[in-house]
C-alpha cells in the first residue's frame, strides 16, 4: 500500500486471549518513505470506538500480548503504538555509548535521543492521521526512564500531545547530567560534555516549556533516585508552571518517598489509566479548569469526601 506520506508495509494478525467484545489486532507497520526506516508495533481492538486515542511509546510490543499495564485501556478502545527508528550508530566506534557507563558518550546518547524523538514522532503522527481510525487530537505518551526522558522532548517540541505519563524521568537534561558526578555515577575522563552535545542542548526540553501547554503532564519519580535525580524533574515542572496558570491541574509531579529508580510495579497501570482517562478519554472531553477557592471556608469544603461538613465532624460552633 502506498500513501502520499509514506511507503507502508503492514503485517497483522488477531488474537482473542485478552477477552472483550472484539479480537485484539496486532500490526507491524514499516515506514520507508525516508531514511532511516521506522517500525511501528500497534495493538488495539477494532470497532470499540469510532476513532482510537493512541498511546505512543519508544520500543516494541510482543506480537501476541499487550503490556500488563495496558490491558484495560486496550479493551476500552485505546491503541498502543510502540515505535523504533533505525538511526545508524556513530561512524566512530569509540564514540558509541556503552550501556550504564556514565560518561560523555552516554550523556550524548540521551540528549541526541531526545532531539531525534521530537522529529521521529512527526512521522508516526502523520501515519496515524492517515489511517482514519485514530483521533489525532488524542495522542498520548507513556514512558519510564530511557523512554520517558525523550517523551518530554516530544511534549515540548514535537506534535501536540494530549497527555504524557513519565516515570522516573526528567525534562531538564543539562541539570540531570550535572547530577551524575555528585551522585556517584560519572565515569568520564573529563568533566566536560562534547561540543556536539552542547549544541543539542539548545533543545533541552526545559528551555521550551513555553510550547508545552495544554499537554497534560504527569511525572512520577522516586524521591531517593540517584539515577534520575528528582530535583531535576521538579526544576522542569517549576519552569513549566507559569505557562499552566489557566489550568494548573494539567501539570503534576508525584514523588514516592523511600523509593529510588524503581517504583512500585502496580503504579504504572494506576497512573496510566487515571491520566489517560482524564485527558484523552475515547469519548469524553477533558475536564474544565477548576476555579480557585475564593476563601478558606470554600477551600475546606472542597476537602470533604462525603456529605458531612468538617465543622460537624469536630463539633465546632
Where are the regions that the model predicts?
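Short beta-strand element of the alpha/beta-hydrolase
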Residues: 51-60
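Cap/lid segment of the alpha/beta-hydrolase catalytic domain
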Residues: 65-67, 71-119, 177-179
